[in-house]
Amino acid sequence: MALLTAAARLFGAKNASCLVLAARHASASSTNLKDILADLIPKEQTRVKAFRQQHGKTVVGQITVDMMYGGMRGMKGLVYETSVLDPDEGIRFRGYSIPECQKLLPKAKGGEEPLPEGLFWLLVTGQIPTEEQVSWLSQEWAKRAALPSHVVTMLDNFPTNLHPMSQLSAAVTALNSESTFARAYSEGINRTKYWELIYEDSMDLIAKLPCVAAKIYRNLYREGSSIGAIDPKLDWSHNFTNMLGYTDAQFTELMRLYLTIHSDHEGGNVSAHTSHLVGSALSDPYLSFAAAMNGLAGPLHGLANQEVLVWLTQLQKEVGKDVSDEKLRDYIWNTLNSGRVVPGYGHAVLRKTDPRYTCQREFALKHLPQDPMFKLVAQLYKIVPNILLEQGKAKNPWPNVDAHSGVLLQYYGMTEMNYYTVLFGVSRALGVLAQLIWSRALGFPLERPKSMSTDGLMKFVDSKSG
């Protein structure tokens, strides 16, 4: 499994195999996620301790002046267990690619897309769950979903001009009143028990997020109509779409896919790093996740799919809905020559087509192949990369996840673009909270990198070159 694959190098192949078999046996025999974690964590603590004792002084990489001024881009400085972003392959969740997750993770009865519950189980344990384990998780989240009255009152009294992401962040912060970790910490709980309380808070928060998000949507766009009640027989995504007011089974399938693929993207992006940083101060999961959502609300992180839709709409307005390849090329070149970018193309790390784009494209080809906006997106996919390569400036001319997601949401009637980042946030909770559990389990300390002033950096460089 992903947590133990390197054990052979430290403990010997035979002992490592025993650990893997023991973990798999625990996974197969229990539907209680916390029980499985209680079995896995001591083994991983031992593995990490041995690794650090043997290789703690090993140099991982060099830091350049450009890295320090350039947003620490490419700097290796975090341990993040749940996912790894490969420039050529895209994201891998505990070693599994998106196509593998689509194939292996359990699905709803009659459905074709993976259930986010299965992805969360994978992120936490490193194991593909059984249908029974996923069903347990769906029911567990349904049990924990109710919102406290003060949060409901708060959401119902927000002004309608308050951005949905501001409402989400504020409501999650207010849920901190329910934190079992915060209460236990104030009472002096032993640090070896931290992960157990972080687990409980994380499970509660994930369970409540669809209720919070749906209430925001109904208050802003559906005249404050009721979100209804959680159905314990339905999965997490299905309950979410019901509360939003959507009854189309295809939209529920899209939501399962969307919430799965947006869940995690290794640890260096703004929302993941923020939750990791704030959590390292032993802020509870509610405060850590609220901080992450404030980062996600920034236009450089969570608003890209809105920018794509605005650009596509403007394109259609200027050149028409049924545009030739030649006219489309001219429009793209005009966009680039005016100093603007083509939204939805390029990525800070990826150097190939984002597999999150590809799986959304496959969904559209299956369910909405004749939709005019999808046809335009598909047409751009044929044309834009070659133009960007010809221009010679882009390191990655290929589309990313944001080039497609907004078009799919629009097709099923969710046209409120300001709300899209809330969906992103609900999904991202799966990844960052899974990691937060492991950060406390492995005893990660307060994050405190060293900063330097420009003058200090110049003196340092002079001393090196002199």
From Swiss-Prot:
PTM-bearing positions, type N6,N6,N6-trimethyllysine: 395
Positions where N6-succinyllysine occurs in the chain: 57, 76, 103, 193, 321, 327, 375, 393, 450, 459
Matches recorded under InterPro entries: Citrate_synth-like_lrg_a-sub, Citrate_synth-like_sm_a-sub, Citrate_synthase, Citrate_synthase_AS, Citrate_synthase_euk, Citrate_synthase_sf
GO cellular component: mitochondrial matrix
UniProt modification remark: Methylated. Trimethylation at Lys-395 by CSKMT decreases citrate synthase activity. In response to mitochondrial stress, the precursor protein is ubiquitinated by the SIFI complex in the cytoplasm before mitochondrial import, leading to its degradation. Within the SIFI complex, UBR4 initiates ubiquitin chain that are further elongated or branched by KCMF1.
PROSITE patterns the UniProt entry points to: CITRATE_SYNTHASE
Residues reported in the UniProt entry to bind oxaloacetate: 356, 428, 448
Highest taxon above the source species: Eukaryota
Biological processes, Gene Ontology terms: carbohydrate metabolic process; citrate metabolic process; tricarboxylic acid cycle
Pathway the protein acts in: Carbohydrate metabolism; tricarboxylic acid cycle; isocitrate from oxaloacetate: step 1/2
Locations listed in the record: Mitochondrion matrix
Keyword Acetylation (UniProt): yes
SUPFAM superfamilies in alphabetical order: Citrate synthase
A single GO molecular function term of this UniProt record: citrate (Si)-synthase activity
Major subcellular site: mitochondrion
Family named by the database record: Belongs to the citrate synthase family.
Miscellaneous remark of the record: Citrate synthase is found in nearly all cells capable of oxidative metabolism.
Subunit-structure text: Homodimer.
Functional note: Key enzyme of the Krebs tricarboxylic acid cycle which catalyzes the synthesis of citrate from acetyl coenzyme A and oxaloacetate.
Name by which UniProt lists this protein: Citrate synthase, mitochondrial
UniProt source species: Bos taurus (Bovine)
